[in-house]
């Protein structure tokens, strides 16, 4: 039996680590033990994350002890440090259905669950049985979640999925195609949630902001709802662009 890994700190350069390639260098706690970390903000793989150079918050990520997949009977137990790519590969190799929408969706499982990630009508909570926090397992029906958000205010260490057979390569290919129009450069992902009955990207384009740029930050010409960094974008440029689009 392998020896348990303790918590430790590591230095993270958020200009390299975050998907938008903006941010300071900070010491980050790597959590390998279940406990109370209410003083820390969990950041996952740094997707949809924009950190001010003046930020004084304490950050943490889940470590190696929470990167696992356990297949038991009709349930799948997955640690929240597990990447979406690793989980998708496992379900494909083991002919497990329902998670094909993870194709080309970046991030670790913890972040995907926190924001109820998905694509169009597919979302991760559709397939969840329960989640595990420091207080134990919580059934899905006792979690407050909705479109692209949850009200989970604690760390989720593990997710339990319902398991059914029948992985669909056709569905995986369809989800891959749906995301092929997304920018391939540094990005914070979708900037605004879709309002009911419409699409944020369409609205941004309708008011003439598709391709609008301040410095190296831009609302992408490929997909208007994506805030992209052409190389040397700054926190202030990103915030100014966001605020101008809201105004």
Stretches with model-predicted labels:
Residues 7-27, 59-80:
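Active-site-proximal helix-loop elements at catalytic-domain edges
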Residues 1-43, 48:
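N-terminal, positively charged, Ser/Thr/Ala/Gly-biased leader segments
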Residues 34-42, 64-112:
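FAD-binding glycine-rich core of flavoenzymes that anchor FAD
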Residues 98-129, 187:
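A gly/ser-rich beta-alpha-beta helix-loop segment of oxidoreductase catalytic cores
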Residues 15-19, 49, 134-243:
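Phosphate/pyrophosphate- and phosphate-bearing ligand-binding catalytic cores of soluble enzymes
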Residues 246-247:
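A short, hydrophobic C-terminal helix/tail in secreted or cell-surface proteins
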Residues 21-23, 27-32, 50-68, 114-141, ...:
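Structural signature of FAD isoalloxazine-binding scaffolds in flavoprotein oxidoreductases
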Residues 85-87, 108-116, 121-123, 138, ...:
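Short, well-ordered, mixed-charge alpha-helical segments that flank or form enzyme active sites
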């Amino acid at each position: 039996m392998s020896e348990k890994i303790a918590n430790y700190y590591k230095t993270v350069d958020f200009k390299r680590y975050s998907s938008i390639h903006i941010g300071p260098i900070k010491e980050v706690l790597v959590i390998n033990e279940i406990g109370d970390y209410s003083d820390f903000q969990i950041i996952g793989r740094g997707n949809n994350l924009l950190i001010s150079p003046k930020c004084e918050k304490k950050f943490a990520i889940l470590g190696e002890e929470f990167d696992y997949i356990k297949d038991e009977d009709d349930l799948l137990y997955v640690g929240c440090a597990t990447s979406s790519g690793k989980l998708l590969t496992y379900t494909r190799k083991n002919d497990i259905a329902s998670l094909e929408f993870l194709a080309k969706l970046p991030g670790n499982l913890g972040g995907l669950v926190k924001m109820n990630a998905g694509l169009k009508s597919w979302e991760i909570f559709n397939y969840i049985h329960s989640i595990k926090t420091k207080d134990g397992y919580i059934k899905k029906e006792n979690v407050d979640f909705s479109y692209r958000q949850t009200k989970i205010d604690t760390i989720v260490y593990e997710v339990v999925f319902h398991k059914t057979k029948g992985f669909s390569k056709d569905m995986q290919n369809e989800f891959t195609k749906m995301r092929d129009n997304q920018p391939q450069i540094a990005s914070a992902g979708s900037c605004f949630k879709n309002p009911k009955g419409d699409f944020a990207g369409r609205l941004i384009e309708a008011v003439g902001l598709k391709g609008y740029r301040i410095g190296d930050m831009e609302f992408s010409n490929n997909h208007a709802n994506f805030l992209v960094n052409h190389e040397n974008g700054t926190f202030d440029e990103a915030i100014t662009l966001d605020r101008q689009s809201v105004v």
